Amino acid sequence: MADEYNAEEAAELKKKRTFRKFSYRGVDLDALLDLTSDELRDVVHARARRKINRGLKRRPMGLIKKLRKAKQEAKPNEKPDLVKTHLRDMIVVPEMIGSVVGIYSGKEFNQVEIKPEMVGHYLGEFSISYKPVKHGRPGIGATHSSRFIPLK
């Protein structure tokens, strides 16, 4: 068996990489992009389903219209222009995939490119609104033993 090894075949196998095909809850990406809002509602989780049932109001629809316009105006094989929004409670729908959104964190707009893995999540999940705590040394009065730490 060892003498049947062919270097050309091994190189060809290495070139032919297989990527994991994306699916959201058992629905392929191509089929996901073709879903209507009613069909999408049946696929997403309960919290998103409830939000979709209540209807997309003026502001979320306005964001989707801006994203459509940005995608339409973009040149082929290029990212669309940034669309800024304060709508952190907007659920990512398949139509938004490939768009670039500036999500407001309360201080600044964080630029995020929407990927297929983000479908069903809220926009706010991708723009952190607080600065994570970096724990340093305890201050004076933090514990009883800190009374014996000499002052600098």
Curated annotation (Swiss-Prot):
Keywords: Ribonucleoprotein, Ribosomal protein
GO biological process, one term: ribosomal small subunit assembly
Classification via SUPFAM superfamilies: Ribosomal protein S19 (SSF54570)
UniProt GO molecular function: RNA binding; structural constituent of ribosome
One Gene Ontology cellular component: cytosolic small ribosomal subunit
Leader sequence residues: none
Transmembrane regions listed in the UniProt entry: none
InterPro entries: Ribosomal_uS19, Ribosomal_uS19_CS, Ribosomal_uS19_euk/arc, Ribosomal_uS19_SF
HAMAP family, per database record: Ribosomal_uS19
Family the entry assigns: Belongs to the universal ribosomal protein uS19 family.
Name the UniProt record assigns to this protein: Small ribosomal subunit protein uS19
Organism: Podospora anserina (Pleurage anserina)
